[in-house]
Amino acid sequence: MAAEEHALTSTEYIKHHLTNLTYGKMPDGTWKLAENAKEAQEMGFSAIHLDSMGWSIGLGIIFCLVFWCAAKAAKADVPSKFQSAIEMIIEFVDSSVRDTFHGKSRLIAPLALTIFVWIFLMNLMDLIPVDWVPMLAQIVGAHVFGMDPHHVYFKIVPSTDPNITLGMSLSVFVLILFYSIREKGIGGFVGELALNPFNPSNPVAKALLIPVNLILELVTFLARPISLALRLFGNMYAGELIFILIALLPFWIQWALSVPWAIFHILVITLQAFIFMMLTIVYLSMASEKH
């Protein structure tokens, strides 16, 4: 349990572990690190979650370096275990793309690989004991920057931050729009929204049903990035919260509960990365289809 447990109640302990390291502009015009959730809220859209951004970028760099090293060390005759593992991941993603995406694009397979591995690495951070990195951040904040340890927040699981998951899903949404307009044209894209799901042969009925179709299709279309983001965020946030609740229990109970939950959570970590990747492929495949 965290070193500050004697000073914090259980509720404060949970809130502390679920609060991001936030930097932003205060209403008085000053830029600073938020010392509590209220200050972070006052920063509004100028607030930046430094921990989520830092870990996301860092894990992205690790992903690129690992695959770059694998490519540099690749051998055609006798592949190493490391090369074999990387090739298995690539072949798995490539087969998923070939089975699901029916359009023609060189972007989809690299995009799917990036999404799967990057989200998997972000989710994997949830297996690090909840107090280790925050305690280190408190020590650094107190001794290097002279900060109050109780005001040092540091989350290490980027996928438990809705800003990160929404950012990724909105990027996918932009690609969906791009492929839809590229393959169908603006007229075809608008027509697809206006003439589905109800498309009677009678011209009058067709015209009357256009507003209904637009409402239904726009809601469905706009719900895709939101559901994509919230599904990943919700599952990972719940998993992190359970680890935090386990950390509040006596030491001898923690191991009895945390180990089985961590083993089960490995499945959740992998499954959520896979679901995000597959839904991205499916949505882009639908956008690439010509009707």
UniProtKB/Swiss-Prot annotation:
Compartment annotation: Cell inner membrane
GO cellular component terms listed in the entry, alphabetical order: plasma membrane; proton-transporting ATP synthase complex
Keyword presence, Ion transport: yes
Main location: membrane
SUPFAM superfamilies listed in its UniProt record: F1F0 ATP synthase subunit A
Top-level lineage group: Bacteria
InterPro entries: ATP_syn_F0_a_bact/chloroplast, ATP_synth_F0_asu, ATP_synth_F0_asu_AS, F0_ATP_A_sf
GO biological process, one term: proton motive force-driven plasma membrane ATP synthesis
PANTHER family for this protein: ATP SYNTHASE SUBUNIT A, CHLOROPLASTIC
HAMAP family with a match to the protein in the record: ATP_synth_a_bact
Homology family: Belongs to the ATPase A chain family.
Protein name: ATP synthase subunit a
Source organism of the structure: Acinetobacter baylyi (strain ATCC 33305 / BD413 / ADP1)
Source taxonomy: Bacteria, Pseudomonadati, Pseudomonadota, Gammaproteobacteria, Moraxellales
